[in-house]
Regions:
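Small-residue-biased structural context
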Residues: 1-159
C-alpha cells in the first residue's frame, strides 16, 4: 500500500526557469499523486489506473530524461555525463519496481513509487538540475510532446 506520509508537491522554488522542463517536472508530481491515490485502496477498477499510470510514468521518464539530455548536449553542458548517470540510476530503480509489480502483482511494491518519484525528483531538481539553471534556456529545449521521444521517434539520440 502507499505510504501514509504526504507526498512532496511541486513548489515554485523548484523551477529551473525553462518552461517545458518545469511543466514536465510538475507533471511528474501530479502523476505521483494519482498513483498514490490509486494504490491507497486498490480494487479491480483501480488496477487499470495503476497499469495506466505506470505506462505514463515509463513514458515520462524516458521522454523527459531524453529532452533534458538533448538540451544539455545542445548547450555543451559540462556535467552531461554525470546527469545521464543520475537519470539512468533512477530509471533502473523504477524499472525494477515496475517489473516486480508486473511479475507478482504486489500493490505494496508499486505503492512505493509515488514517494520514490517525488522524493527523488525533489532532491534531483534542487541539487542536480539546479546546476544547469541559467545555462539551459527555452531555446535549447525540444518542446514536442514527450511521446515523440519516448516512442523512439526522436532521431537525435544522446549517447
Amino acid at each position: 500500500m502507499n505510504q501514509t506520509n504526504p507526498l512532496p508537491e511541486w513548489t515554485d522554488d523548484l523551477s529551473v526557469n525553462v518552461e517545458i522542463i518545469d511543466e514536465d517536472h510538475q507533471a511528474f508530481f501530479r502523476l505521483a499523486a494519482l498513483m498514490n491515490d490509486v494504490t491507497a485502496t486498490p480494487d479491480n477498477d483501480q488496477l487499470y489506473l495503476i497499469e495506466t499510470s505506470i505506462n505514463i510514468l515509463e513514458e515520462y521518464i524516458e521522454g523527459h530524461f531524453l529532452r533534458e539530455q538533448k538540451a544539455m548536449a545542445k548547450a555543451d553542458y559540462a556535467y552531461l555525463v554525470e546527469h545521464i548517470a543520475a537519470h539512468d540510476a533512477f530509471a533502473d530503480r523504477v524499472t525494477r519496481i515496475i517489473q516486480d509489480y508486473r511479475q507478482t502483482g504486489s500493490i505494496e511494491k508499486i505503492g512505493t513509487l509515488p514517494h520514490l518519484v517525488t522524493d527523488w525528483l525533489n532532491n534531483h531538481i534542487r541539487v542536480v538540475d539546479a546546476q544547469y539553471k541559467g545555462i539551459l534556456t527555452n531555446a535549447n529545449v525540444d518542446d514536442r510532446p514527450l511521446v515523440y521521444m519516448a516512442a523512439g521517434l526522436d532521431t537525435e539520440l544522446v549517447s
